[in-house]
A protein has these predicted regions:
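Conserved amphipathic alpha-helical segments that form helical-bundle/coiled-coil interaction surfaces
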Residues: 116, 137-199, 211-219, 228-239
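Short, flexible turn/loop "capping" segments at secondary-structure junctions
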Residues: 64, 97, 166, 209-211
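Short linear motifs at protein or domain termini
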Residues: 1-133, 245-260
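Mobile beta-alpha loop/short-helix "lid" or hinge segments that flank ligand
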Residues: 91-96, 189-191, 206-208
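C-terminal all-alpha effector/ligand-binding and dimerization domain
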Residues: 2-24, 39, 146-151, 156, ...
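Residues at helix-coil transition
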Residues: 56-57, 178, 222-223
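Short helix-capping/hinge motifs at transmembrane helix termini and TM-loop junctions
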Residues: 132-133, 178, 202-203
Length: 260
């Protein structure tokens, strides 16, 4: 009998896993990693993308084993590229490897979330400050136009368009920093916090609040007020951290990033 690529832990069955919207998951992956893709993707690249989408778009929050044999069979590849893809995901922080028990979906602790988002906040604020003098006002206005388009459609819950708007602003600021090492570190962090960004689309009020934050950041940058933009970005990321902690751990003292 063939094993499931994601095996249930001893506590129960994998019965609540979300069915992946292939179009949306492909768009999200392309938005995040399209600029880093090889011109001709390898078999490992393909396996990595498919497993990444499975992890990011799953609602399951239990520790589960990832079978390289079953994944290889499901994806139509040999075991070696499936294993190499899992090893890459270990480096990205989405999977953990146990020498005796194989590969497992990483379960984030509250301390992990604090560390990820605190580091993200510090690095993205630095990226904004480095990027600000180089930013083209036309790019900022284009981002505002996209934001207003998303806002007009909020009642329709435009998941894809919202994520596009969200990822594009952060990517614009990070890449415009011109600091290769900073971009590299944030790319690795993004592998970890992107799954929480995707899950935020389940909360329309959070999407609305995030758009409000983005608008204020963009207007501050267009007005040449870099200090204000940096302060707003830091608060935006702190709110995102509070939401993740409240969602996963019900941590008290974390204000919800939702409007009443």
């Amino acid at each position: 009998m063939t094993k499931s690529p994601v095996e249930p832990d001893e506590a129960g069955e994998n019965s609540n896993a979300q069915v992946i919207d292939e179009n949306l998951s492909a768009e999200v992956f392309d938005l995040l990693w399209g600029h880093d893709r090889n011109a001709i993707p390898t078999v490992v690249d393909y396996a990595y993308e498919q497993i990444w989408k499975q992890l990011v778009f799953s609602n399951e929050q239990k520790e589960q084993r990832l079978s390289d044999v079953a994944l290889a069979e499901k994806l139509g590849v040999s075991r070696t590229p499936a294993r190499q893809a899992l090893e890459r995901l270990v480096q990205d922080g989405l999977v953990r490897s146990d020498p005796r028990r194989g590969f497992w979906v990483r379960m984030f602790t509250a301390q992990d979330i604090h560390e990820i988002y605190d580091l993200r906040g510090a690095l993205e604020v630095l990226a904004l400050r480095l990027a600000a003098p180089q930013l083209d006002p036309a790019d900022l206005r284009s981002q505002l136009d996209l934001l207003y388009k998303v806002r007009e459609q909020l009642d329709q819950r435009p998941f894809s368009l919202f994520l596009q708007c969200d990822f594009r602003l952060h990517t614009l600021l990070i890449r415009a920093s011109g600091n290769g090492l900073l971009i590299q570190y944030l790319s690795r962090l993004r592998s970890q916090f992107s799954m929480f960004q995707v899950k935020d689309t389940s909360y329309p009020k959070r999407m609305e609040a995030a758009l409000d934050d983005h608008e204020q950041i963009l207007l501050a940058l267009l007005g040449g007020n870099i200090d204000k933009a940096a302060e707003l970005l830091a608060a935006h990321i702190a709110h995102a951290k509070a939401n993740v902690l409240a969602d996963i751990f019900g941590e008290k003292g974390t204000a919800s990033f939702e409007k009443p």
